[in-house]
């Protein structure tokens, strides 16, 4: 019993819920925890949409989100979005926990600046699996599925199923 309790304390969401329920006598949702961290404690406070409190978003002015994408960011923890060159995400795209979206690399001659390049474009209704990495300049068509842990380094057309490091298309979805 003690070991299980200690394991739960290692996960911040569960730890916050246990503390609030046990000592304050209230139950709390993930949405409320995100609100407290983002709006009151100002972690990712400059972002207009809700983000999970364990995620980090940089360059918020360069992000364009489609319809319902913010819900996935609010529920998927541990995500990292660096949008130096811009990130455009289509409607109803879903992200797993730990997804990394990196839109710019450092200039090799000056490590304090980013290389200018095209934005990352992710189509509508895509699924991005847990711990997947999407690198600068990538374009994913609509209805793509990126497997867990895949590293996407190049463009893929619509309805591609991507896996591996570097990601490769293993098949097309059948609608």
Predicted stretch roles:
Residues 97, 102-118, 124, 130-175:
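Glycine-rich hexapeptide-repeat left-handed beta-helix
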Residues 1-103, 108, 124, 175:
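Domain-scale signature associated with acetyltransferase and cell-envelope carbohydrate enzymes
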């Amino acid at each position: 019993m003690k070991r299980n309790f200690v394991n739960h304390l290692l996960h911040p969401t569960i730890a916050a819920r246990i503390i609030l329920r046990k000592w304050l006598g209230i139950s709390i949702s993930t949405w409320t925890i995100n609100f407290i961290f983002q709006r009151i404690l100002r972690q990712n406070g400059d972002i207009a949409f809700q983000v999970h409190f364990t995620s980090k978003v940089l360059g918020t002015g360069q992000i364009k989100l489609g319809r319902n994408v913010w819900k996935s960011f609010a529920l998927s923890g541990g995500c990292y979005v660096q949008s130096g060159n811009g990130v455009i995400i289509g409607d109803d795209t879903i992200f797993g926990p730990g997804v990394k979206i990196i839109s710019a690399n450092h200039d090799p001659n000056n490590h304090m600046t980013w290389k200018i390049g095209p934005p990352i474009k992710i189509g509508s209704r895509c699924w991005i699996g847990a711990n997947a990495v999407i690198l600068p300049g990538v374009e994913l068509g609509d209805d793509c599925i990126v497997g867990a842990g895949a590293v996407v380094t190049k463009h893929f057309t619509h309805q591609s199923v991507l896996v591996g490091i570097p990601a490769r298309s293993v098949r097309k979805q059948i609608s």
